[in-house]
Amino acid sequence: KEGYAMDHEGCKFSCFPRPAGFCDGYCKTHLKASSGYCAWPACYCYGVPSNIKVWDYATNKC
């Protein structure tokens, strides 16, 4: 699956002001995703395993 990485409060994980390539590494390391990029202003991840939670509009509290 794919989606936005979340912080500890369930909000989208910000990529501002992170260096280029930060989100790719973050998604791979923390979400076990295949890749990721900064979809300003938040990290968006591809190839996230189905058991890993990503940000969901329906349950957004931020």
Curated annotation (Swiss-Prot):
The modification Cysteine amide is found at residue 62. Expressed by the venom gland. It comes from the Eukaryota. PROSITE patterns: LCN_CSAB. It is found in: Secreted. The keyword Secreted applies. Pfam families: Toxin_3. Its main location: secreted. GO terms for molecular function: sodium channel inhibitor activity; toxin activity. Keywords: Amidation, Disulfide bond, Ion channel impairing toxin, Neurotoxin, Secreted, Toxin, Voltage-gated sodium channel impairing toxin. Residues 1-62 form the LCN-type CS-alpha/beta domain. Beta toxins bind voltage-independently at site-4 of sodium channels (Nav) and shift the voltage of activation toward more negative potentials thereby affecting sodium channel activation and promoting spontaneous and repetitive firing. This toxin is active on mammals. Belongs to the long (4 C-C) scorpion toxin superfamily. Sodium channel inhibitor family. Beta subfamily. This is Toxin Tb2. It comes from Tityus bahiensis (Brazilian scorpion).
